[in-house]
Amino acid sequence: MSKKRVHEIAKELKSHGIELDNKEVVTELSSLGYDVKSHSSSLDDDQATAAVQKILDKRKPKQATPPVTAKGFVVRRKVGPPAGATADSGAEASQAAEPAYEPPSAPEPATFAAEEPVQAPPPVEAPRAPVEAPSAPEPQRVEAPVAAATEPTAPAAVTSTPPAQVAEATKAPAAAEVASPPPAAEAPQAPVEAPRAAVPAPAAAQPRPSVQESTTLPQPPPRSPVPPAVRTPSSTSSSATVVSRGPAPGYQQRGGPGGGRPGGPGGPGGRPGGPGGPGGRPGGPGGPGGRPGGPGGPGGRPGGPGGRPSYQGPGSYQGAGRPGQGPVRPTSAPGTGVQASASASPIPQGPTIMVGGVPHAQVSPTGTARPTATQAVVISRPLIQVRRVTPTAGQAKQYPMAPGRTGIPERREYKVVPDHLGRGRELVDVSKNKERGQRKRTSGDTQSVSKQELTDMVWGRVTIPIRGKKRKPTKKGAKTQITQMAEEKKVIKLQEGISVSDLGQRMGVRSAELIKKLMGLGKMATANQLVDADTAEMIAGDYGWKIDRVGFEVEDYLPEVETRPEDERPRPPVVAIMGHVDHGKTSLLDAIRKASVAQGEAGGITQHIGAYSITTARGDVTFLDTPGHEAFTSMRARGADVTDIVVLVVASDDGVMPQTVEAIKHAKAAEVPIVVAINKMDLPTANLDRVKKDLATHELVPEEWGGDTIMVPVSAKTKENLELLLENLALQAEVLELASNPLRPSVGAIIEAKLDRGRGPVATVLVQEGTLKLGDAVVTGSHYGRVRAMTNSRGEQVKEVKPGYCAEVVGLSGVPGAGDAINVVADEKAAKQIAEHRNMKERQTELSKVSRESLEQLFAKTKAGGGPKELRVVIKADVQGSAEAVKQAVQKLSTHKVKVEVVHSGVGAITEGDVMRAAASKGVVLGFNVNPESGAEAAAKAQEVVLKSYSIIYELIDGVRTEMEGLLEPIRTERKLGRAEVRNTFNVPRLGTIAGAAVLDGVMKRGAIVRLMRENKQLFSGKMASLRRFKDDVKEVAQGFECGIGIESFNDLKPGDIIEAYEIVETRQSLT
């Protein structure tokens, strides 16, 4: 179901003439009970429509609903004019009335007789019409001044039109206009034979021009006039209502136009047909007791036998009804109608209603009715659908509605609301009914309507009869049908592994159930723990699922390169300088570069990998300076992996050291040729032969000894044989025939990476293949980005880097790991996909390492005293390589007593977040070549977190070892101080019992821990409360002196007791 917002409701109100802004509309809706907060709040379509209608009803005056009349047609006729009426008054009355239908043509008007109001009018002379008395089964004749044939409708009562409405009465189709006052008409006299010989002939009517005359029947009781009522077709009455009255003085009929509806034959007790107009229907024969048919006009209806002849005289009109309404009943003119019997008694009660020839009811007028009053007669027939005639707004006053519950159906108001299932609509009765109140329609009355019909219903407040959709009956309480997934669709695609919760979500199985399955397989797992593809396939098979292993191939996203020899170009060699710490590696490089990098290193040792490109007489050479400390093992290994030649620097006075051996192993593992530079040849303690001998033990045999290892004795201080070293490097590069394709997408290696405060992540990249250019999309490890800027080793901004050269690259999403490969891809989108895949694999690997302890392991740890202590550290370093080296060095310090756990290691300054991370894990923060931020120091003091920064690697290691020893419980030992014998006891108020003792040996110190011995048994151990000599408080009393000793919480002292004094000494445990 669609929704409408408040501002849309305001626009809709504006289209209806209600000017309200959004705030006012929100206020109005809130007052109506709708939950709206602002102009962007929304309501359902039905609620919005109902709310608009309520606001319109409140803001706009409600228009009167046009009255709905009963279905059928109304027959109206004019009675004689009132006494004293003049032609002018008749004309004014005729002009004042609004005709419901204008006849096509009107013959000359007939004249009306008018008398003075003070004089009694003479009797009206009615045409004589003898009525024969037929036999019992034959129809009888009923004398009436006027005969009219109408189509039967629902039976209705007859009422006289009030005088106030006479001027607004509608003219009959053939109403005559008043031309001149004619002479007084004679009273009609017509003998009437009672139908079925049961009704006596009425007497002559009294000369009352305003009172109607009709046949009288003694059977029906008189009743007061009631307004005409419309009865439904299902009424049990099946006869028509006949109204008869005497003719007005001087009233004449005139022939109507042709085309009128023909009259039907009169039934038993029915009304005879009237005179037919040109082209009208011929009159049918009168039934028993009915009125005779009138003479037919040209093409009109002939009079039937046995009935009362209808009159056709001058000025009489044949029935020509309004379109779609049937013929208008004819009226009689003076001298041409049926005369009333002179012996007929006057009937002051009013007209008699005949139903099927039998008197149905008698109307007793309460006042004098005007002869020109219009009377409505509603005739009905059972089981015939009638048409409802609804007058316009202007005609509502002229045609009053028939009252009564059966005449006008009850109006109900309904509200359209969603049904209880939310799939359809239903109508709720909101009519004001005190008896029933609001009632909800049953499901059988539920109807589906269109949006336009709903809108019309709400705006017009009317019920639209619509047909609802047929729905199949459903059984209550039927269970929901669950559709089973096809077997070919029950496939889960995996790359490496999947978490338990994700696997359960894909199969539609609860995670707790899968955990039970894993426990049955002997694996303890949590909902977020990853399981490998094999385990997932085993579990999924139990539920009818299959595992499809789909590997993520990075090669699919990397550009394909065709290697062609003609595209290869020579490139400069990459040389890594390796060796033991303090053997002069950086000094030798400074001598070659003619710079002084070693002076800038903290502690005079190299703790980073430095990449430098140097131009020599033999060409360009790229040097990588690696650290020699044992903590930087990974750096040396990384340097050996990306280099072409390794220069092993060995001090001539120290010879081969542990890191020298390690460097030899890294170079051999990388299958890189080694050139040995024996440094410090300027020292008097230099021993070249010893160094060569030591190297030969590690399979590095010099060329002069028949080997293939180039050894050059050099001196970084005196720059001895530096040119010879460079020449040998060039020769070795020519032997290797180093070449690469500069046209292919670039491939390189991350030598070092750091987080610069101004530039962000900065990576030192060694380009191995292709040309790295500005704007290239790159991916390295789990990070990606676009090359924003590049700086060479001399600090110059460059736009491209050729193979064999180094540069600092800015633009990565994070600090990459040292040693990671860097690749140029087609676009940044592909780089992001590769990085996200690698990040997911790293996360899966980390989660798979986390395992829950079994109950046996937990009991064993508790029994062993909780297991080894743990030192949790947070490491921050200036570059990624240093952070990795520090992490490895710290983890190597773990022993069986204390285990070091690295909570986090990163690059950059120490932040407040690092301090909070350490506080949460109850650890320490270690910084290497970085300083803490201002907020970090304050947070460390507030959280009581140890924060230490170091610039030299071995100082950091010593500090960590000290922290580890501090976690161990100290060793507590007793150190004996002295002994004293109790000679006497004294009771001192507020101090208790004081022992007068003599010091036997050692020293008695105040505050020491004492042990009371009695007969070589310990009675009490506590703290010495006081120590006095005479009246003075003293700190200690030596051997051979007497003193007073008080013991806390102990007064049971006796002479001869021995008091031993001692103290607890704590010593720190060692990590071993």
From Swiss-Prot:
Keywords from the named record: Cytoplasm, GTP-binding, Initiation factor, Nucleotide-binding, Protein biosynthesis
SUPFAM superfamilies: Initiation factor IF2/eIF5b, domain 3, P-loop containing nucleoside triphosphate hydrolases, Translation proteins
Single Gene Ontology MF annotation: translation initiation factor activity
Record region (Disordered): 55-369, 426-452
Bias (Pro residues): 218-230
Localization per Swiss-Prot or TrEMBL: Cytoplasm
UniProt region (G4), positions on chain: 679-682
Location of region: G5: 715-717
Biased composition (Basic and acidic residues): 426-436
PANTHER family to which the protein is assigned, alphabetical: TR-TYPE G DOMAIN-CONTAINING PROTEIN (PTHR43381:SF5), TRANSLATION INITIATION FACTOR IF-2-RELATED (PTHR43381)
UniProt cross-references to NCBIfam families, sorted A to Z: IF-2, small_GTP
Protein name per the record: Translation initiation factor IF-2
Taxonomic placement: Bacteria, Pseudomonadati, Myxococcota, Myxococcia, Myxococcales
Gene: infB
